[in-house]
Structure formats: structure tokens, C-alpha cells
Amino acid sequence: MNPDPIAYPHRDEMPGSHRAAERVVPTILAITGPVRSVVDVGGGDGGWLRVFQQHGVEEVLLIDCPEVEPHLVIDRRYLEPCDLSRDLPAPRRFDLALCLECAEHLPAHRAVQLVEWLTKSADIVVFSAAIPGQGGKGHIHLRFPDFWNELFARRGYRRHDVLRPRIVADRAVAWWYRQNTFVFASSGAKLLSGQTEFLPNEFYLIHKDIAENLV
């Protein structure tokens, strides 16, 4: 029996997520180069993975709650249902891992395990999480980027602020993606060279359009 479609609380946010994916996925691939496999943790209906598939990615996996199943825009065989607030499945290796605006929905004590799982799954992680003042439905763990940067650094992953310079002024992309999204990469990861990157002292950079949305 399918889960009740009404039970998934973020269904109204999916159209905006789809628009963002259409704009941002090509930019991600311009930074990473071609990838064959992508896992998305907390990816809702699979909208971001669908765009990656449209760009030639062969293997995708969505990890999210079972309530997303009636809303999927990718084949249901790509969903691994999981209560992210309690546990994650055994990690598998992918070329790229996504975790976008998911971490703030999880209890604070899950943060370390989430980052460990992501870094065990891929050498390149595209990550965003809500910041204090952002507001939003079901947000229980709001942190500034340096909190997450420290957790990734413990795992040997360096922050590359190469995505925000390309999307921060794009109003077709929801402001939280423009503000919060970073690339984290292991020492062995290969990113395309010549990327524009915000300087470390701009780590908390908030675009004037985005500042208007903070509470």
C-alpha cells in the first residue's frame, strides 16, 4: 500500500527545487567534470537526480523517507527508503554525493554521522544546509557554514566555494541554494581547474537579495 501523499510535508516546495536543479546541475558538472553516478540524501521527489540523468548520469540513488514515493519523478527502483533522523543505509561508492537543504531537518546529534556517510560515499560532495535566521518548515538544526566545514575537514575534505559565485545572483534559483551550497572534496578528488572561488573572508557572504529573506 502506497504511503499517504498528504503525509509528505515538502511536496509544495518541489517545483522550486526542480527549477533550481535545471539551473544548477549543469554548473555542478562544469565544476566536477563528467560523473557516472550520483547519490542524493534527502532529495525529496528525485528532481535533482532526474536532471542529472538528463545530463547523462547512468547510476542514481535517492535516499529519503518512504513518504516521498507517491511524488517521485524518477523510477521508484532508484529510491532507498530510510528514516534519516534515525539511521542511514550502508554507504556505497558514487562519483558525487548531494545533500541539499536536508541536514537542518535532522537532530543535531545526527550531524557527524551524516557527514561521515557522505564522505564515505563520494570524493566530491555538494552540500547545503539552512543557516540561522533562514526559517522554514521542520528546521530544527540551523548552523552557519563553518560548523559543517569543520565536520568535513575532520574527514579530510576541503571546502571549495566555487558554486556560489556562479549562482548567487540567479533569481531563478531559490535563495537558500544560492546562499548555502558548497562543494567539499577529498584530497584525491579532481575538480576542473580555473574555477572562480569566493575568498575565505567572504565565507559568510550574503547577497543583498538574499539578506531580505532572513528573519
List each model region and its residues.
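Conserved N-terminal segment of class I S-adenosyl-L-methionine
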Residues: M1-L98, H109-S121, G135, H141-L151, ...
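A short His-aromatic
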Residues: H105-L106
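Hydrophobic adenine-recognition pocket in adenosine-nucleotide-binding enzymes
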Residues: C102
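Conserved beta-strand signature within the Rossmann-like core of class I S-adenosyl-L-methionine
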Residues: A122-P132
